[in-house]
Amino acid sequence: MQLFVRAQELHTLEVTGRETVAQIKAHVASLEGIAPEDQVVLLAGTPLEDEATLGQCGVEALSTLEVAGRMLGGKVHGSLARVGKVRGQTLKVAKQEKKKKRTGRAKRRMQYNRRFVNVVPTFGKKKGPNANS
């Protein structure tokens, strides 16, 4: 069966289906010059194990395998290392039931009582509702 291998260039390989992924990596290494240990072979975005055969991995005729090079690194510096830290450390608190707010006539009645009925008369200049003293 034919198999397409997309590395730096697109290659067509003739395989039987009993080859291992390691053999495909060795073949790509001879074509592209990338060391087999530096290659990652992907089928539909999922990496394939070296010892698995193409048949076990579900590779069919005219499938495309992608070969990507391994990236150096591993440490994350700066603010990316702390992404999500605060949210992960914050404790989850259960929502509390709130009393239903009054609307319409009941709300107007409450406002009237607050403004005119329950007012304690004081001497001096009148102060607004947002005054700090």
From Swiss-Prot:
The keyword Cytoplasm applies. The modification N6-succinyllysine is found at residue 125. PROSITE patterns: UBIQUITIN_1, UBIQUITIN_2. One of its GO terms (molecular function) is structural constituent of ribosome. CDD domains: Ubl_FUBI (cd01793). GO terms for biological process: translation. SUPFAM superfamilies: Ubiquitin-like (SSF54236). InterPro entries: FUBI, Ribosomal_eS30, Ubiquitin-like_dom, Ubiquitin-like_domsf, Ubiquitin_CS, Ubiquitin_dom. Pfam families: Ribosomal_S30, ubiquitin. FUBI is cleaved from ribosomal protein S30 by the deubiquitinase USP36 before the assembly of ribosomal protein S30 into pre-40S ribosomal particles. FUBI removal from ribosomal protein S30 is a crucial event for the final maturation of pre-40S particles. One of its GO terms (cellular component) is cytosolic small ribosomal subunit. The keyword Ribonucleoprotein applies. It comes from the Eukaryota. Keywords: Cytoplasm, Nucleus, Ribonucleoprotein, Ribosomal protein. Residues 1-74 form the Ubiquitin-like domain. In the N-terminal section; belongs to the ubiquitin family. In the C-terminal section; belongs to the eukaryotic ribosomal protein eS30 family. FAU encodes a fusion protein consisting of the ubiquitin-like protein FUBI at the N terminus and ribosomal protein S30 at the C terminus. This is Ubiquitin-like FUBI-ribosomal protein eS30 fusion protein. It comes from Oryctolagus cuniculus.
